[in-house]
Structure formats: C-alpha cells, structure tokens
C-alpha cells in the first residue's frame, strides 16, 4: 500500500520541499529534544505492525477492483426463477464469481486489529459469525472511532428468526465429477441450504417495496449532466434501509471458523442477488464480491443441530467449517489462489509469557509436543474437586465442556453461598416465564402424530430451543410449574431462577437498558468526565440526552462533597478551608451565591441571617410569620459554610436547545472539577477513594430490591454481550421506554394481557465504569417448523443474564478472562477445545485445570495442521508477526 494511504499529507510535504520552492522550511527540532516517553507503548506497537498489515490492505483493495465481463455477471432472471422450481435439484448450475482473502492466526495475535485497520482504510461490510463475535468487533472498532453497530453475517444476507428451525440438508446434491468445478460446488451448497435461501429469495421478489433507488440516482445524474457514478453515494444518505451488500463488495466475517462450509456460497449468492435486484452500480460494473474470512481453523468447530420431533431429541453434529473448506478443498483453493490471498498472524499478544506463547503455537499449528511442554502444563494441574469447590478460587471463571456441568456448578455455588454467611454475595431467586399457545401446541401434536404428548415433556425437551440463547441451560433453575388460562388460550410455565448479588454477569443478547445513576468513587466519576467515554458509548442516538443525563448526575451528586466533610476524624482546619474554598468557587460560577462567600469570611462566626435572604431591599423589621420557628432553628444551628448554596441559588431546569444543554453541563462539570481539585489538595488519596453515588432520583434498598422514586432524567442505551456487569439487585420501578417498546411488539393478545399484569421485575446492573442501569426483560418468540408448516408456539420471558463465574468452553471463544479454572472431560478430549480454553487467560499465573490434556488420550486434527505448516513455508503467504 502506498504511503499516502497511511499518511495522507506526506505527498504534499514532499512537493513543498522540492527544488525551486520559495516556501521557507522550518528546521526540524534537534534530536535531543525528542522524548520517547511522550508516546504510549501502543503507538510503537502499531507502527511495528504496520509493515505486516500494509500488504494485506493492498491485496484486499486489489481484489475489490476485480471485475468480470457482462457475460459472466449472474442475470437477475436466474434468481427470479428459483422460487418457482419444484425441487432445488432442478437448479441450473451457474458460476457465481467471487474472491476470498483468508486471515488466520492463533488467539490474541492481532486479527481483530487487522479488521480495525481495514475498517479505517476502505469501505467494507464488517460482520461476525455469531452475535458475540459481532459485538467483540464492535467493541474493538468503537474504542478508536464512532462506528455503526456490527451485525452477524446472517443478519446481513437476510436470515430471519423463522429460519432458525429450518431443516438444512433436506435435499442433497452429488457432484457429477471429481474434482468438481466451482459451479457444481456452489449448486451443492445452495441445495443444502435451500429451505432458507428460497424463503429469502421469495421474500425479496414478492416484496412490494421499491428497489429503484440507484435508478433514480442515475436519472438525476443524467438530468444534471453529471458524470455516471458521481452521485451514487447519495443513495445511502437518502435511503438508510438499503442492504449493506449493495454499498461495497468487501465482506469481512470474523470468527468464520464457526460457520459451515456452505455459508461461503450462501453469502456469495445473496450478494449477487441483492445487487442484481437493486441494480447497484457495482453490479453494472461487474465487480466481484471479496469475502474476507477471519479466524482460526484449528480453534473452532462448525456445529449443526437437528431436532427430531418424534423422539423430542436434538442432535448436534460437527461439520466442516468454512476456513477448513477453503484451505483443504482443491477446487476452492485453486479458484481463489489461496497462496497469494492468505495472511497468517503469529504470536499471542494476549498472554505475553514466552514459554506459554510457545505452547500455544504448538497446539495451534500441530507441532510436536515435547516432554518440556507437558511439564509446563503439569504446573497448572490441581485436583478436580478443588476446582469444583466454590470455596476455592473465588472470583475465577470456571470453564466446562457442557451446559450440564455449568448448571451443576452454579447450583453448588448457590448452595455454598446460602450457608456461608457471606454478606456481599447474597443469593436470590426471580421467576422466568414461558407462555405456550394451546392452539399451536394442539396443532403440533396433530402434525407430529403425538396425541398423548404432555406440555411438561415438550417444555423439558425444548428448554434450550424456546429461549434465544444456549446459556439458558447454564442457569440454576427450579422445577417448572404450569398454569392454564383457558380464557386467554395460554399455558404459563413458571421457573424460579437463582442469581447472586454483586456477581459478575453478562447479557446473553443485545438488549435495551436504561441508565439512571452512578455508583463508584470520586476518582472513577472524575475519570468518566475527563475521558468522555460515556458520551461516546451512550450518546449513540442523540448526544444531547447524554449531556442532560450527566448534568442531572452532577447536580444530584454535588452534595457528596459536603457529606465527605462530615466524616469523623478529619482535620477541622482543613474542613473549614474546604467549606471556604467551595463557597468561593460556587460564588464565582453562580452569581446569586455571593452572599455565601461574604458569610464565610465573617470572622465572628455568628450564624448567617437566613431570614434576611428573603427580605426586600431596605427592609428593617417586621413580623416573623414568614418563617417557621423550627426552620429558623435548623438553619441557624448550622455553621454558615455547611450549606451547599448551589441548591439554594441554582434552579436545575431541563434545557431544550443544544447550546443550553452543553452550557449547563459545562458549568456543572467545571464546578465538580473545581471541588475535586480542592479536596485532592486538602485530603489526597483518602478523598478520591471515597464513595460517590448519584442518581436521577432518590433510591433505597430493601434486601436485593432497589426502589427508585422516578426514572425521569435517565437515558436509554444498549447492553452488549461483550460488556461486563455487576449484578446490583432488581427493581419493580416503571421504566416508560420499556413499556412503550412492549406496546410496539405484536404479541399474542392473551400473552400481552397476562404479561402486562405480572409486573415482572427487572435487573439492575452496574457497568465497568460505574453507571447503574435497569435492564429490560429478554423476550423471545419461538416458531417451530414441522413439515413446511410454521407454528408460532411460545414466548419466553427471562432476564437475559449469563454468569461469568462459569461457562462452557465454546461460550468463552473470543473472550479474554483474568482468572481461569478449567475442567476438561476425560473422554473425547479434543486439542482444539484445549487450545480455546487455555488461550482465554491473560496470564498463565492465573490458570488452573483438572488434568494435563497433553498426557491424556486426545484427538488432533493433523490434516488442517499440515496445510497450515505448508503455508508457513510458502513464500507467497503473508506472515504477520
């Protein structure tokens, strides 16, 4: 990539210094003036990585310019014919051109950083294979610049909720030759994924919505006499609902190793179909989609599930993932010229210990395991009973191979906390509900020919399918109790779920939250104000709401400075000085508070005449009926400096204009920073570590329940699966944005009425910055697909929380964990699962496991490892250290 891509102004600098230039050149600063400590280490790390990433960016950009002739462009008519076919086996094979660039590497090697660079240097659609992967990428991108939310690849190509239960592989197509040509492989994948693809295709072409946005832009160009394509970008400014695939031909998929091999063709198919249907400029130019697959083929498995209705069993099997398919399939490998379109990232930057990093490379690339490696892993082994005892390793994350083991540990942990007398970690239970429609259930029994099927049995078999996340099986849940409401046509199944107060949790899906306060220390709140992190993360819809909210917290929280001065043991002289300085600061920022400053300078120490504050000018006497004697005694008894005149002289209103909103925030922020500086000067570290709590209204606690006077003044936001939260309790306080959101959902009439009457509590969480929020309930609808019939069966309502105290190894993929204790199974031990589990830790000092997997009998995928080792020796493959 040219230097101008990284340093846009460099070329202009060279021009100004060329021979004959009249411009005076400022001499550079002497070398001795340069201080390398002025820059953080991250700056140097980014520059050392740039050399390796530049060729990756340049090659992907080169692939994105590739075009095919008009004869090679898939015609729109071919896509329109597909829904009319009786069977997908009748599909006429057609070559759908595409390019692939593969980015692989071991855990923590910088693959996500490469995605960040691609996002900043070119127009591309960034996606994740799963919701967790998508949100991990979003977290990475938003840490540097404001970015739109990242969708999964399924959301981008048109996958919908009713496709979850689709029966994949219902039709099978066998290629007629070996090795098969690319169009034969593509037909095989389309036939395999037919139930989903035909529904997406039919839905697109049967839609009455206009798809002439690009035609309108081209007509406008002709009308204005502009060059073709000069106004194309306006289409995305005026039509926000345009598919992202019509904007660019570069599609990036993070954690692509979790996808089955057929998804490569599915993405290519949908890209061509959407661009053909919308007649996009890149379709007219014959541009070819570039699928950038990011991940590790040795870390992950692609899993497919199939539910057998007759026996009520869910069968899960592993299938060839898309990365392995690209690397090992001869036809695909040669078609995409893999050697010149592959970058391998090496070195684990998550855990930077040399010996441990070498061990990770051995597991990643299938290198020979030596006795030295085994002895290193021996140092991490402790008895399994030690890991499974909740009294040991408090605060560590347990990793298990199955949901059943996670649930068993959570039940053991809760039982331990109930008898331990622990005050910080208190156990409490809340109900979760599943609403089953009786008419749909009766129809299901009829279609599946199971007239005697009981609802209890069906619920037990479908517990993991009814909810919208697999971690629901990790919970410590009680026995399900069913209640029939005949008038509503609904059966309500209630299950009590146990939670731990003050434990670390994460949300299980992207959920709505309502931020209403802050709970932390003076130091952490000061850091939030200086960093503007809240504005960047919470002000996604309108920054004014975020500033209004912070102004509310600042105004409510100022009293904390005065509360600190009432602590016993403080030096009285410094306390008086703090009162005096705060009074002067308040008088400076709020002119009406100047009376306080003069009172604080009164050497006599006489009480301030509060009655005089309300007397008109020139008033010398009169009746005292305007003042209640009790109030007079209260005010007169206070030392004149102990009253925060901010609350006496400043009327807190909610401004409307942007200028007024920011002016109010700036004044209150200046006052907070000024007071913070005064207290740091007088009290130092004792002050900055003191608690600072502020909310939009008064709150109180009763056990694990939190009572809030009003939520007015809070701000609505989004909770992501990648965020870490502390569970602070629950509340039944009404949150009107949640009520409005529920009203907009098209729920079954009986379910909506029953759920509305339950007044289901909502969880209160504190994020890593200290902000307190109410989390909306997690409501998911379950649609069953049986023999081409879709049945709207049930609606599940729970709290959408997953504990970070224990999880499955598969769930931990992509996470960085501080302290990890792993329980590996003694049978069916796979090295790729071992690698995923061990590579989660940021330091091997905080890693424990129940056995040494290298000394146990295990399975190892040597085929893919051999291909990766061959690639490392291939000079055409880009290696990034």
Curated annotation (Swiss-Prot):
GO CC, one annotated term: host cell nucleus
Keywords: ATP-binding, DNA replication, Helicase, Host nucleus, Hydrolase, Nucleotide-binding
Binding residue positions for ATP: 105-112
Subunit structure: Associates with the primase and the primase-associated factor to form the helicase-primase complex.
UniProt record, GO biological process: DNA replication
MF (Gene Ontology): ATP binding; helicase activity; hydrolase activity
Basic and acidic residues bias spans: 13-32
Disulphide connectivity of cysteines: none
Region named Disordered: 1-32
Known function: Component of the helicase/primase complex. Unwinds the DNA at the replication forks and generates single-stranded DNA for both leading and lagging strand synthesis. The primase synthesizes short RNA primers on the lagging strand that the polymerase elongates using dNTPs. Possesses helicase-like motifs and therefore may act as the helicase subunit of the complex.
A Pfam short name: Herpes_Helicase
Gene label: HELI
Family named by the database record: Belongs to the herpesviridae helicase family.
EC number of this enzyme: 3.6.4.-
Record organism: Equine herpesvirus 1 (strain V592)
Main location: host cell
Subcellular location: Host nucleus
UniProt name for this protein: DNA replication helicase
């Amino acid at each position: 990539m040219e230097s101008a891509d990284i340093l846009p102004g460099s070329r202009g600098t060279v021009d100004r210094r060329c021979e004959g230039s009249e411009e005076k050149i400022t001499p550079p600063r002497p070398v001795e003036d340069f201080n390398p400590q002025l820059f953080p280490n991250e700056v140097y790390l980014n520059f050392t990585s740039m050399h390796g990433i530049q060729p990756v960016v340049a090659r992907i950009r080169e692939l994105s310019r590739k075009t095919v002739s008009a004869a090679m462009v898939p015609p729109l008519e071919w896509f329109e014919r597909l829904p009319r076919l009786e069977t997908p086996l009748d599909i006429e094979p057609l070559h759908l051109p595409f390019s692939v660039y593969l980015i692989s590497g071991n855990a923590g090697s910088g693959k996500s950083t490469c995605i960040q660079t691609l996002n900043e240097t070119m127009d591309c659609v960034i996606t994740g294979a799963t919701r967790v992967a998508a949100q991990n990428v979003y977290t990475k991108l938003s840490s540097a610049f404001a970015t739109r939310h990242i969708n999964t690849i399924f959301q981008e190509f048109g996958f919908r909720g009713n496709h979850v239960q689709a029966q994949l592989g219902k039709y099978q197509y066998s290629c007629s030759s070996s090795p098969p040509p690319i169009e034969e492989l593509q037909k095989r994948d389309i036939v395999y994924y037919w139930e989903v693809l035909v529904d997406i295709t039919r839905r697109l072409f049967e839609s009455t919505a206009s798809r002439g946005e690009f035609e309108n832009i081209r007509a406008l160009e002709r009308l204005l006499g502009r060059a073709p394509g000069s106004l194309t970008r306006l289409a995305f400014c005026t039509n926000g609902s345009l598919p992202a695939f019509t904007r660019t031909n570069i599609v990036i998929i993070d954690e692509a190793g979790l996808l089955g091999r057929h998804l490569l063709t599915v993405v290519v198919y949908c890209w061509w179909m959407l661009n053909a249907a919308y007649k996009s400029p890149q379709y007219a130019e014959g541009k070819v989609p570039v699928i950038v697959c990011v991940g590790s083929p040795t870390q992950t498995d692609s899993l497919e599930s199939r539910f057998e209705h007759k026996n009520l069993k869910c069968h899960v099997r592993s299938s060839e993932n898309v990365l392995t398919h690209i690397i090992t399939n001869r036809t695909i490998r040669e078609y995409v010229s893999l050697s010149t379109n592959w970058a391998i990232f090496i070195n684990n930057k998550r855990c930077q210990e040399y010996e441990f990093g070498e061990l990770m490379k051995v597991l990643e690339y299938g290198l020979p395991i030596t006795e030295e490696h085994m002895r290193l892993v021996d140092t991490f082994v402790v008895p399994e009973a030690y890991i499974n005892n909740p009294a040991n390793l408090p605060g560590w994350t347990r990793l298990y191979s199955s949901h059943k083991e996670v649930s068993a540990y959570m039940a053991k942990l809760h039982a331990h906390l109930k008898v331990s007398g622990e005050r910080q970690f208190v156990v409490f239970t809340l109900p979760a509900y599943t609403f089953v429609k009786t008419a749909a259930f009766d129809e299901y029994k009829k279609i599946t020919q199971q007239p005697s099927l009981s609802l209890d049995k069906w619920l037990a078999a479908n517990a993991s399918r009814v909810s919208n996340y697999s971690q629901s099986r990790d919970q410590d849940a009680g026995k399900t109790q069913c209640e029939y409401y005949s008038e509503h046509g609904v059966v309500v199944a209630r299950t009590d779920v146990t939670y731990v107060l003050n434990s670390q949790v994460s949300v299980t899906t992207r959920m709505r939250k309502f931020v209403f306060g802050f709970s932390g220390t003076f130091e952490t709140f000061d850091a939030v104000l200086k960093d503007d992190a809240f504005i960047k993360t919470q002000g996604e819809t309108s920054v004014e709401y975020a500033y209004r909210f912070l102004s509310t917290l600042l105004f409510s929280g100022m009293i904390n400075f005065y509360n600190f001065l009432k602590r016993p043991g403080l030096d009285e002289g410094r306390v008086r000085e703090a009162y005096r300085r705060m009074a002067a600061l308040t008088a400076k920022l709020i002119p009406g508070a100047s009376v306080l400053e003069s009172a604080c300078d009164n050497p006599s120490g006489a009480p301030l005449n509060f009655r005089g504050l309300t007397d008109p000018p020139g008033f010398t006497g009169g009746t005292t009926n305007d003042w209640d004697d009790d109030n007079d005694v209260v005010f007169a008894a206070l030392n004149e400096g102990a009253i925060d005149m901010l609350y006496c002289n400043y009327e807190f209103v909610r401004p409307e204009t942007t200028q007024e909103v920011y002016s109010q925030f700036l004044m209150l922020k200046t006052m907070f920073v000024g007071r913070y500086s005064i207290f740091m000067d007088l009290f130092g570290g004792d002050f900055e570590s003191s608690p600072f709590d502020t909310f939009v209204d008064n709150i109180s606690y009763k056990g694990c329940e939190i009572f809030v006077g009003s939520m007015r003044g809070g701000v609505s936001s989004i909770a992501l699966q990648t965020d870490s939260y502390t569970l602070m309790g629950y509340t039944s306080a009404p949150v009107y944005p949640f009520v409005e959101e529920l009203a907009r959902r098209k729920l079954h009439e009986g379910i909506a009425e029953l759920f509305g009457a339950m007044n289901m509590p909502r969880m209160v969480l504190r994020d890593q910055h200290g902000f307190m929020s109410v989390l909306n309930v997690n409501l998911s609808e379950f649609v069953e697909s049986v023999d081409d019939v879709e049945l709207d069966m049930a609606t599940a309502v729970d709290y959408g929380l997953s504990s970070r105290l224990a999880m499955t190894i598969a769930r931990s993929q992509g996470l960085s964990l501080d302290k990890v204790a792993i329980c590996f199974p003694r049978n069916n031990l796979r090295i790729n699962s071992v690698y995923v589990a061990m590579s989660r830790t940021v330091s091997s000092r905080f890693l424990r496991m129940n056995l040494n997997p290298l000394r146990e009998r295990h399975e190892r995928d040597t085929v893919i490892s051999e291909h990766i080792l061959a690639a490392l020796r291939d000079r055409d493959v880009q290696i990034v250290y």
